[in-house]
Regions:
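Central beta-strand plus flanking loop segment that forms part of the substrate or channel wall
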Residues: 1-10, 64
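Active-site substrate-recognition segment that forms the wall
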Residues: 9-43, 92-93, 100-102
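FAD/FMN-dependent oxidoreductases across multiple families
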Residues: 19, 46-104
Length: 104
């Protein structure tokens, strides 16, 4: 990636990683690893012709991605559901003697 010092790189992909569904893919550099993943709206997954794990495997074989991860090994696998409604969907996060913070 030709990075120096504390630099990092973020590569974003649209369309192809999620087989044409709303969403895309990402590749982020970390100090000694890469993070590779997909983003897809849950409400679109019922229209998917492939499972999410198959979409990820296909993404890993994409000509723009495969050379970047060649020789790498999987060290962690995770999935997250991320709300899309924005700040207006959040409940009150503070009250008498309580504060909710983080990924609660």
């Amino acid at each position: 990636f030709q990075l120096q010092g504390n630099q990092g790189a973020a590569c974003l992909f649209a369309g192809s990683p999620t087989d044409g569904l709303m969403g895309g893919g990402f590749l982020y550099t970390n100090e000694n690893t890469l993070s590779l993943g997909l983003v897809c709206g849950l409400h679109h997954l019922h229209d998917a012709k492939k499972s999410v794990p198959q979409m990820l495997e296909d993404f890993k074989q994409h000509p723009a991605v495969a050379p970047l991860i060649a020789g790498g090994k999987l060290v962690e696998y995770s999935a997250h559901v991320v709300p899309e409604a924005g700040i207006n969907m959040l409940p009150e996060l503070v009250g008498d003697g309580v504060l909710i913070a983080g990924d609660a």
